[in-house]
């Protein structure tokens, strides 16, 4: 896996991740409730970094976490929905011995996302979105938990990865991360669409500092894209820019996301 910083490759990483989950889930119509406990083991094999990094970030680690979550989805289709919404909220409590993390307080992670689709006409759809993820605890957050931003697909390389227009590759972020997005999609021919999209976000070391310009940083990105909806999945291409990369980038994709 490669990690980038402001659009430049900063880290090459190889690791093994093992997960054991014990829990329960219940569905009611379009909503799912889940809770349980996870055991995660991360073993880092190779690490090549161009930037100085905290060694604690990539220590081999065993994590025991308690989790609870709600997921709702009534979007009318997968690749180009025109109505409905999806949202999810979850809470994780991470430890390394069931009670503490490195002889300190456990790490709390609150995660929320929302996406809605509104169609003023049969060919035009407005899709706003919101993502938020906040960590609190000891402050020595490992790579397995730390916030990550970039790409177009949530959780593409790591479960905590949040998409952002104009940041096409995964980048590490601070402990408090809020992102808002907007996609304007127009159907031009049968199964063919063009979109204009944008993202704005803020991140900081502490949640209460996220609106303080001296303690936080903002991110902004814009893009334009084309999509063809085939029976094998959507074919997509996108041109974009962000104030993180400070250059025009591109993304291409094919197929459904599972």
Q: Language-model features: where?
A:
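Gram-negative/organellar outer-membrane beta-barrel architecture
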Residues: 1-71, 75, 149-161, 170-178, ...
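Outer-membrane beta-barrel translocator domains and adjoining extracellular loop/strand segments
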Residues: 1-7, 45-53, 81-83, 97-106, ...
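A generic structural micro-feature
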Residues: 14, 60, 81, 104, ...
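C-terminal hydrophobic structural anchor segments
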Residues: 185-220
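Membrane-embedded beta-strand positions of outer-membrane beta-barrel proteins
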Residues: 33-37, 68, 87-89, 128-132, ...
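Transmembrane beta-strands of outer-membrane beta-barrel pores
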Residues: 5, 28-30, 39-45, 72-74, ...
């Amino acid at each position: 896996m490669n990690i980038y910083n402001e659009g430049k490759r900063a880290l090459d990483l190889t690791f093994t991740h093992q997960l054991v989950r014990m829990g329960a889930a219940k569905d009611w119509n379009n909503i799912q409730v889940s809770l349980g406990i996870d055991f995660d083991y991360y073993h880092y094999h190779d690490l090549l970094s161009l930037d100085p990094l905290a060694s604690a970030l990539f220590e081999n680690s065993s994590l025991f976490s308690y989790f609870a979550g709600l997921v709702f989805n009534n979007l009318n289709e997968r690749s180009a929905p025109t109505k409905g919404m999806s949202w999810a909220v979850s809470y994780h409590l991470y430890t390394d011995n069931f009670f503490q993390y490195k002889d300190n307080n456990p790490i709390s992670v609150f995660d929320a996302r929302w996406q809605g689709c509104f169609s003023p006409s049969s060919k035009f759809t407005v899709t706003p979105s919101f993502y938020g993820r906040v960590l609190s605890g000891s402050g020595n957050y490992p790579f397995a938990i730390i916030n990550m931003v970039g790409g177009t697909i949530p959780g593409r390389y790591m479960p905590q990865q949040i998409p952002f227009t104009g940041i096409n590759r995964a980048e590490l972020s601070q402990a408090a991360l809020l992102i808002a997005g907007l996609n304007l999609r127009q159907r031009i021919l049968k199964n063919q669409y063009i979109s204009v999209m944008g993202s704005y976000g803020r991140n900081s070391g502490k949640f209460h500092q996220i609106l303080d310009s001296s303690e936080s940083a903002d991110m902004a990105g814009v893009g334009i894209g084309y999509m063809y909806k085939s029976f094998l999945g959507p074919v997509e291409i996108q041109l974009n820019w962000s104030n993180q990369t400070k250059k025009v980038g591109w993304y291409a994709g094919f197929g459904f996301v599972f």
